[in-house]
């Protein structure tokens, strides 16, 4: 399995065997770190981290993973990057490609990370775009593998909520690529695009995956092993949009009742974070005062329950990102 010098832009670019190879390497690197016997395989490498969108988990995961492996990083924050403003993506790619061994990009359009990859001459890693979140998918798959006690191709999961963007798109493709039973529970207006659904069905034909899209949240979660969700509204969207989205998605909120509707007493809750699950943030308090909701996409009761594995999931961002970098750059 040769993943050397490979870009990591979206799961559609990889075979099921290649995705599994990343997961196996991540598990191996995680075990080595826990045992204190990690071997540095990226000594002398330098990685540029371009962030057009702010981040906690993605930035920390890339920085810690790189340093664990002996590599250096340069963080280009949103205000410092000239990409697309004073300098074209093509020129930025060619400059950074001369100085760095790899480039991570977290930002808006998928076309930006694809163009970086086209011109950089070094591996480019997608830390998140509007369309895809592939490093999160490796973390999610590793977490499900650790917690399900059975092979991924015998595992079922649901994503409930707004499924139009990177998490809904990516989870649908992940499940299809790995032969899983994947369900999307959302109003039809918030389903992934027809192109993404078609790509998932094409992958499922190869892997035997089962794909379900439904407007019924209870139907989506029936007999699943994992229930995923994500935030319903992005910060900066007007209050009217929040109200409209909350009204549209109220039946898709992850509550103890929805967890119980799975019929699986061992069902686990997953979220890529950050989550609006209580009033302990300025945003959470504003949501409570404005809409009367204590927690939005998930209740505090579920988020803090033993069923919640969100912090295992967050930790696995680092191990899986490390696997992507080691596979591409490691000695």
UniProtKB/Swiss-Prot annotation:
<dbReference type="Pfam" id="PF00185">
    <property type="entry name" value="OTCace"/>
</dbReference>
<dbReference type="GO" id="GO:0004585">
    <property type="term" value="F:ornithine carbamoyltransferase activity"/>
</dbReference>
<feature type="binding site">
    <location>
        <begin position="133"/>
        <end position="136"/>
    </location>
    <ligand>
        <name>carbamoyl phosphate</name>
    </ligand>
</feature>
<dbReference type="Pfam" id="PF02729">
    <property type="entry name" value="OTCace_N"/>
</dbReference>
<dbReference type="InterPro" id="IPR006130">
    <property type="entry name" value="Asp/Orn_carbamoylTrfase"/>
</dbReference>
<keyword id="KW-0808">Transferase</keyword>
<dbReference type="InterPro" id="IPR002292">
    <property type="entry name" value="Orn/put_carbamltrans"/>
</dbReference>
<dbReference type="InterPro" id="IPR024904">
    <property type="entry name" value="OTCase_ArgI"/>
</dbReference>
<feature type="binding site">
    <location>
        <position position="106"/>
    </location>
    <ligand>
        <name>carbamoyl phosphate</name>
    </ligand>
</feature>
<comment type="function">
    <text>Reversibly catalyzes the transfer of the carbamoyl group from carbamoyl phosphate (CP) to the N(epsilon) atom of ornithine (ORN) to produce L-citrulline.</text>
</comment>
<keyword id="KW-0055">Arginine biosynthesis</keyword>
<feature type="binding site">
    <location>
        <position position="317"/>
    </location>
    <ligand>
        <name>carbamoyl phosphate</name>
    </ligand>
</feature>
<dbReference type="InterPro" id="IPR006132">
    <property type="entry name" value="Asp/Orn_carbamoyltranf_P-bd"/>
</dbReference>
<feature type="binding site">
    <location>
        <position position="166"/>
    </location>
    <ligand>
        <name>L-ornithine</name>
    </ligand>
</feature>
<keyword id="KW-0028">Amino-acid biosynthesis</keyword>
<feature type="binding site">
    <location>
        <position position="230"/>
    </location>
    <ligand>
        <name>L-ornithine</name>
    </ligand>
</feature>
<comment type="pathway">
    <text>Amino-acid biosynthesis; L-arginine biosynthesis; L-arginine from L-ornithine and carbamoyl phosphate: step 1/3.</text>
</comment>
<dbReference type="GO" id="GO:0019240">
    <property type="term" value="P:citrulline biosynthetic process"/>
</dbReference>
<dbReference type="InterPro" id="IPR036901">
    <property type="entry name" value="Asp/Orn_carbamoylTrfase_sf"/>
</dbReference>
<keyword id="KW-0963">Cytoplasm</keyword>
<feature type="binding site">
    <location>
        <begin position="272"/>
        <end position="273"/>
    </location>
    <ligand>
        <name>carbamoyl phosphate</name>
    </ligand>
</feature>
<dbReference type="InterPro" id="IPR006131">
    <property type="entry name" value="Asp_carbamoyltransf_Asp/Orn-bd"/>
</dbReference>
<dbReference type="GO" id="GO:0016597">
    <property type="term" value="F:amino acid binding"/>
</dbReference>
<comment type="similarity">
    <text>Belongs to the aspartate/ornithine carbamoyltransferase superfamily. OTCase family.</text>
</comment>
<feature type="binding site">
    <location>
        <position position="82"/>
    </location>
    <ligand>
        <name>carbamoyl phosphate</name>
    </ligand>
</feature>
<feature type="binding site">
    <location>
        <begin position="55"/>
        <end position="58"/>
    </location>
    <ligand>
        <name>carbamoyl phosphate</name>
    </ligand>
</feature>
<dbReference type="GO" id="GO:0042450">
    <property type="term" value="P:arginine biosynthetic process via ornithine"/>
</dbReference>
<dbReference type="GO" id="GO:0005737">
    <property type="term" value="C:cytoplasm"/>
</dbReference>
<dbReference type="GO" id="GO:0006526">
    <property type="term" value="P:L-arginine biosynthetic process"/>
</dbReference>
<protein>
    <recommendedName>
        <fullName>Ornithine carbamoyltransferase</fullName>
        <ecNumber>2.1.3.3</ecNumber>
    </recommendedName>
</protein>
<feature type="binding site">
    <location>
        <begin position="234"/>
        <end position="235"/>
    </location>
    <ligand>
        <name>L-ornithine</name>
    </ligand>
</feature>
């Amino acid at each position: 399995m040769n993943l050397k010098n490979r870009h990591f832009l979206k799961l559609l670019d990889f075979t099921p065997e290649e995705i599994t190879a990343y997961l196996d390497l991540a598990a191996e690197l995680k075990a080595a770190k826990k045992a204190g016997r990690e071997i540095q395989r990226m000594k002398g490498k330098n990685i540029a981290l371009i962030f057009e969108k702010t981040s906690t988990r993605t930035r920390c995961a890339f920085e810690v993973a790189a340093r664990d492996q002996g590599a250096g990083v340069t963080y280009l924050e949103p205000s410092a990057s000239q990409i697309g403003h004073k300098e074209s993506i093509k020129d930025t790619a060619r400059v950074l490609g001369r100085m760095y061994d790899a480039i991570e990009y977290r930002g808006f359009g998928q076309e930006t990370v694809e163009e970086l990859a086209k011109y950089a001459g070094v591996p480019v890693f997608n830390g998140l775009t509007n369309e895809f979140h592939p490093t999160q998918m490796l973390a999610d798959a590793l977490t499900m593998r650790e917690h399900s006690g059975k092979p991924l191709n015998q595992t079922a999961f649901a994503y409930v909520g707004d499924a139009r963007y990177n998490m809904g798109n990516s989870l649908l493709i992940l499940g299809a690529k790995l032969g899983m039973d994947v369900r999307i529970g959302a109003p039809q207006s918030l389903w992934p695009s027809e192109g993404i659904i078609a790509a998932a069905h094409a992958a499922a034909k190869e892997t035997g995956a089962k794909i379900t899209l439904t407007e019924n949240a209870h139907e989506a979660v029936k007999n699943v092993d994992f229930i995923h969700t994500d935030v319903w509204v992005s910060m900066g969207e007007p209050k009217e949009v929040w109200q409209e989205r909350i009204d549209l998605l109220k039946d898709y909120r992850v509550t103890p009742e929805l967890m119980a509707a799975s019929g699986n007493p061992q069902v686990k809750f997953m979220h890529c974070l950050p989550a609006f699950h209580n009033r302990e943030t300025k945003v959470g308090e504003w949501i409570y005062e404005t809409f009367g909701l204590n927690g939005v996409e998930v209740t505090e009761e579920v988020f803090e329950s033993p069923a919640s594995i969100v912090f295992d999931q967050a930790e696995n961002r680092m191990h899986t990102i490390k696997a992507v970098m080691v596979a591409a750059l490691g000695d």
